Every structure is written in C-alpha cells, then in structure tokens.
Amino acid sequence: MRSSRSAKVSLVGAGNIGGALAHMLGASQVVKELVLVDVAGGMTEGKVLDVGQALALLGSDVYITGGSDYAAIEHSDAVVVTAGIPRKEGMSREDLLNTNAAVVRNIAENIAKYSPGALVIVVTNPLDAMVWCMYKYSGLPANRVVGMAGVLDSARFSFFLARHMNVSVSSVSAMVLGGHGDLMLPLLRYSTVGGVPVESLIESGRLNRDDIAAIVERTRKGGEEIVKLLKTGSAYCAPAASCAHMLESYVRDKRSIMPCSAYLDGQYGVRDLFVGVPVIIGEKGVEEVVEFPLTAEEQAVFDQSVELIRGSVSAIS
C-alpha cells in the first residue's frame, strides 16, 4: 500500500456519510486522493465541488473527484461502501436484506474488477450481513473486508458514559462485541474511565448498575434515537468519523485495536461469519482478531448476536 502522502481512497455512496467522510479525510490530509462514486452522478459532482471548495479554505491539497463511473475507483488503496437504501415503512427485514444485498453485490463485483488490492470498509445495513455479501461476491481475502459498527457503538458508549460521569471523553475507553444493534455487548470489564475498569467503578460506588444499564440501552438504540430526532435522516457525522478512524489506522499502519465486523475462523467459537470483535487494523487490513476471555453471561449474549447474524445471512436469497 502507498503511504498516506499518496494513498487513494474511494467512497461508494455520496450521501450524507460519504460527503462527511470526504470532508474529514480531506481536512486531515490522511490521504492524497479521494473519489466519490454514486449512481446519482450530478449529486456526486455537486458534492465534490462543495467539499473541494471547503478544503481550499482549509489549505488542503487533497485531490477530490467523482461521478457515476466505477472505473474511477481503479487502483484505490481503500474503498468505503455506504451505498444502499434505508428501511422504509412497510418493508420487511428480508426485503431490506435482499435489496441491499443486490446493491452490495454489484459494488463488490466492481471493486474486484478495478481495485482487487484494496481494503473494503462496509457501512451499508444490515451491517454484518452486508459485510459477508461483500466478502462472498468480491472474492477478496477476509483480511481485506471489514465492517464499521463497533467503532461507532464504542464511541456512543464512551460519549454517554463521559457525560454521565462529567469527565473528558478522552478519559473513557470502551469495548463492544457482537452485532450492530440490540444484541451489541459492551464489555464492562474491559471498558475503563481513567484506566479504572467500569466494573471496579460500580463496586466502589462511583457508578451503579442501573445507570450503566441505561447507558448500555441508550447506546444500543443510539442510531434509532437520532433518526427519531432528525425525522428526515439518520446519523452521518459519527459514522463518518468512525470510518476515518479505521482508515487512518490502515493508511498510516498504526495497528490500532478497535471493534469491527471481521471474519471469524474459529475465534470466539465462530466460523465463516463476520461479527463485531476487537481487531488490529494496519497496512495489511485486519491483521489480527484479538480474543478476550468472556464470562458465561457475556458468551451467552454474544452467541445470541451471532445467531441473529447467521439468520440474516441465511435469509439472503
């Protein structure tokens, strides 16, 4: 992979997340070249102009271009996939699965054609099933396909916990496992505030279990809460920042540990599925799955999450 001074990143899907991510990557100058691709070509080109002009004010020379032709993603070092449709009223879970699976399959085939050496970060929902689709249809090695979910869930958990304790969010380190949704599993024994495990803070009386349970539940419903408040959209700044965090670790070979939807081949007792687990992301993509010992209770919740993901994958026709 090229260094950050020459790295090329393509964003497939030029909606709110794609636009916000383009601005973040351009402003931080983590990459040298950005490409936005979307079936809505005119909108994509308009967003390219808007972001490009914003970057000019920031003194960033990151080159940004875009359109509707997948050939533009050729020789990308990384591709972020946000394209897909949200679940609409009256649409069943299976309808959403199969509609977005078809979208992801088309994108996967184009990535295989134009950028088979790229790291692919999938954001499209339902997340864990769509990462599996990308892996299946692109033919890329498992370490080059990953889903963004746990980074976002961890950020939400950290935000809510920091607000509750009235401390800097930089003092909070959170770790979550499992799928992106109601069965997300925060690991309180491995989540810390100022280096002190959350479990220890509960035992010492600084936190109580009811407060933590409420924070966990709000984290699980974090995306839904934002949708209800916005009324006409969904979260995009935090998902974009989560992708930027992953990309920086990859492009700069930082080997940061973060929770992502990654391929499991026996780790945590799971095979042939993409599930949210802690991983090391470096220049080779997902370089290692980090295994934490789980209690019987934690394992039970994790197993439920795995079965939900397995059911989603099985439902794709």
Swiss-Prot record:
Entry EC no(s): 1.1.1.37
NCBIfam families the record matches: MalateDH_bact (TIGR01763), PRK06223.1 (NF004863)
Positions bound to substrate: R87, R93, N125, R156
Name of this protein: Malate dehydrogenase
Organism field: Anaplasma marginale (strain St. Maries)
Source domain of life: Bacteria
Single biological process term from Gene Ontology: tricarboxylic acid cycle
GO molecular function: L-lactate dehydrogenase activity; L-malate dehydrogenase (NAD+) activity
Reactions it catalyzes: (S)-malate + NAD(+) = oxaloacetate + NADH + H(+)
Function field: Catalyzes the reversible oxidation of malate to oxaloacetate.
Keyword field contains Ion transport: no
HAMAP family for this protein: Malate_dehydrog_3
